[in-house]
Amino acid sequence: MKNLNLTKIAMLLLVFLSMGAFAQKNKNIKTAAIKTTIYCDHCKICESCGGRILKELYNEDGIKTTNVDAKANTITVTYDERKITLEQVRIKISRLGFDADAVKADPSAVAKLDDCCKKPS
């Protein structure tokens, strides 16, 4: 009987410890809506902007999910802050040719965008 009680206590302890570790792990996952400026109206399918943003950010270590909302001019990113900082995410977006909050788009990357994705003159 004592062994059975000890086994139950050990299992409960293991469950509580693993729950704590799981909660600790998720604490490092953050989501941010980054303000940008998207000029084309077919952003999700355009390989020069929306599709490229999704593909490039998805391949970045530490980024879990991305979503481009052309109407709201936002890029929502879920990331693991142990692997990448929000500032690094903004710089990555800038290097793709788009503003990212206060980080301005890299001019050489903007030049490579399709005309529909550039600011109208």
Which positions does each model-derived feature cover?
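Short, thiol/selenol-centered motifs that function as redox-active sites or metal-ligating centers
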Residues: 38-57, 116-117
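Short acidic amphipathic segments
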Residues: 53-69
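Bacterial Sec-dependent N-terminal signal peptides
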Residues: 1-30
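Short glycine-/aliphatic-rich beta-strand segments at the starts of folded cytosolic domains
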Residues: 27-42
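Mid-chain, structured segments of secreted extracytoplasmic proteins
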Residues: 65-109
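Short, low-order "capping/linker" segments at domain edges
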Residues: 111-121
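Short, low-complexity, polar/charged sequence segments that are solvent-exposed and flexible
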Residues: 51-56, 85-87, 95-98, 120-121
